[in-house]
């Protein structure tokens, strides 16, 4: 049984509030429609319910891609991970739980957001719960919320000390996604090539704040490196 997760979290206020409000309103409307369809039909497999669920999943995909574009363009908000000391501290906190809370497969620390892929080292019962849960509900699973709270809470405190500031460091919400069967390689490449995509480096191996698990490096090595 495998429940490898692709998680993206970002700095507070790094997406325009108008964009966030629009997404929240549309998402809430679709969720309400889903509840109504389930209540009316008493069947979560009805054609109407299935159609609405597909629309919700499509909305979430579109929102992820839009956020990724806004983050790469650094449209608004802070870019604290441009400071090497801050980026190092974030990377250090991702490594800290490797082998204890999860098996860390990859990450990329960008100027205002982080992509990471890991497999939680949890009970088979919790793994089953993760696999059953819709992506948007993953953050509410106690075992996962504890992991993310540990990563984000400690790194926020340490980074704020470096920056001599107080206040929110990370946005509360994150993008959480269970990697589907056969999509693992694609997800790893997506994460590692984030800095390549926006022209920071030519090969992912050259980016200081990229990480790939040792056993996977040869599999994903850049052709030109």
For every predicted segment, state its role.
Residues 1-225:
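Short catalytic/metal-binding and nucleic-acid-binding patches
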């Amino acid at each position: 049984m495998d429940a490898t997760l692709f998680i993206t979290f970002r700095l507070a206020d790094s997406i325009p509030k108008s964009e966030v409000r629009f997404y929240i309103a549309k998402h809430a409307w679709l969720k309400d429609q889903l509840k109504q369809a389930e209540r009316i039909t008493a069947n979560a497999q009805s054609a109407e319910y299935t159609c609405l669920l597909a629309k919700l999943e499509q909305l979430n995909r579109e929102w992820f891609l839009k956020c990724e574009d806004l983050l790469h363009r650094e449209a608004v908000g802070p870019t604290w991970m441009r400071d090497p000391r801050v980026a190092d501290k974030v990377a250090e906190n991702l490594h800290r739980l490797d082998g204890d809370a999860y098996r860390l497969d990859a990450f990329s620390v960008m100027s205002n957001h982080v992509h990471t892929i890991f497999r939680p080292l949890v009970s088979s019962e919790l793994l089953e719960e993760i696999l059953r849960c819709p992506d948007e509900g993953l953050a509410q699973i106690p075992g996962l919320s504890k992991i993310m709270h540990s990563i984000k809470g400690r790194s926020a405190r340490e980074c704020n000390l470096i920056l001599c500031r107080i206040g929110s460091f990370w946005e509360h919400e994150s993008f959480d996604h269970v990697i589907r069967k056969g999509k693992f390689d694609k997800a790893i490449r997506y994460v590692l090539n984030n800095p390549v995509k926006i022209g920071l480096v030519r090969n992912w191996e050259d980016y200081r704040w990229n990480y790939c698990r040792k056993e996977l490096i040869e599999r994903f090595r850049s052709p030109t490196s």
